[in-house]
From Swiss-Prot:
Superkingdom, natural source: Bacteria
Record carries keyword Flavoprotein: yes
Protein name as catalogued: NADPH dehydrogenase
Subunit structure: Homotetramer.
Binding site for FMN: 23-26, 60, 102, 215, 307-308
Record keywords, A-Z: Detoxification, Flavoprotein, FMN, NADP, Oxidoreductase
Amino acid sequence: MNSKLFSPYTIKNVTLKNRIVMSPMCMYSSGNEDGSVTNFHLIHYGTRAAGQVGLVMVEATAVLAEGRISNKDLGIWDDNLIEGLHKTTTFIHDNGAKAAIQLAHAGRKAELDTNAFAPSAIPFNDKMKIPVEMNIQQIKETILAFQRAALRSKQAGFDVIELHGAHGYLINEFLSPLTNKRTDKYGGSPENRYRFLREIIDSVNEVWDGPIFVRISANDYHPDGLTVQDYVQYTKWMKEQGIDLIDCSSGAVVPAHIDVYPGYQVQYAKHIKEHTKIATGAVGLITTGSQAEQILNNNEADLIFIGRELLRNPYFPRIAANELGFELQEPYQYKRAPGKIHTNK
């Protein structure tokens, strides 16, 4: 049986063997608290590649040490971190998948002993520290850090990079009027609030020629915040700058109640795709092959990002293939165990 989920997908100069993406998920497992890769990361990502994921995306990786969520985050702020990341891409490639990395800065959500930085001195909630409002020099240094991180990503062998512009982290904080109260050229109008991301994309384009994704929070879930329609305009600007795909998540900009249900964020991928004609990724409580296949067949998204389901079962692609009646070729090492995987779901 033919399956769109298991059909190849080419984006720019990279061809994925299927449409399944391992969504970036922080593991907080840099054992030396120096941003370095550990054996856990090699096993964690290599296993999902062996499980037949098309694109394995490494978790949010900090472009500056002070931009980590925690001191156990992965980092890419120094050349000495390239070696471990290169081992990771080698594990991924050797097991048949393409490798991506999410470049990130936590902004006001950095939970370190040092200062947190943000576009404006507004804490996420009353339990978190008041961040330092970034001055122009700090903004420029952070933009340069993203560029250097992109170059290190190339040296480490990644095929795709994703800029983390979602979930209330630094880029998202500049985009949203809830967190950006600046009165200079980086605040105020949508064009000014987009300027930080615009300059990051421009700087990354100078050193990176592969596909670039951007993860967005397409809904602030706040009456004064951004909606998916605001992100239509942001996406049009990103598309003009050469961004290849928008990874459509939502929320976490400010504390808010979110009604979650299977596929609750697919609507955002569909809306962005329809109104901008850019490729999109759907993410959020997508847990079955039939659900993923329907999203693709309905032209609501181009790639399917799977998170927690891949934590529960690194061989999710095999289960999805069984469900869809698609014959997935297992790694040759596992050919002595043909047939269906049985689950208790």
